[in-house]
A protein has these predicted regions:
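Amphipathic alpha-helical assembly/interaction segments
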Residues: 1-118
């Protein structure tokens, strides 16, 4: 349980950091790429919360991992179209790698209580 709480805390912190950055995107990118990034963040958060309480935890975690990869590309695109500074992209990439590792560790950890009772 400690792992899932840490990942939720870390992901929330990353989400807050990212939203503060997408708010600074120029108008055209804020209402296209910025919104897409924010929606992806909310989707991943929802999947992590569902994994925390679901019997099908790994299904939600695998899906969250895929969404995290899409988010990596969106963040990279933000850097490439020059709406996110290289330094900020570096921080985002490290944060996403850490979150991805935590998801992987959660997948490999012992089954959820619901799964153990089956």
């Amino acid at each position: 349980m400690a792992k899932d709480l840490k990942i939720l805390s870390d992901f929330y912190d990353f989400m807050l950091w990212t939203i503060r950055h997408t708010e600074k995107f120029p108008r055209h990118h804020r209402y296209s790429l910025g919104i897409a990034i924010e929606n992806r963040l909310q989707t991943i958060l929802s999947m992590l919360l569902r994994a925390r309480f679901s019997k099908d935890r790994n299904t939600w975690l695998f899906d969250a991992n895929i969404e995290l990869d899409v988010l990596r590309f969106q963040i990279r695109l933000a850097k490439d179209v020059k709406v996110m500074p290289v330094k900020s992209h570096g921080f985002a990439a490290k944060s996403l790698d850490s979150i991805g590792s935590q998801i992987g560790g959660w997948i490999k950890s012992k089954p959820a209580k619901h799964e153990a009772l089956r």
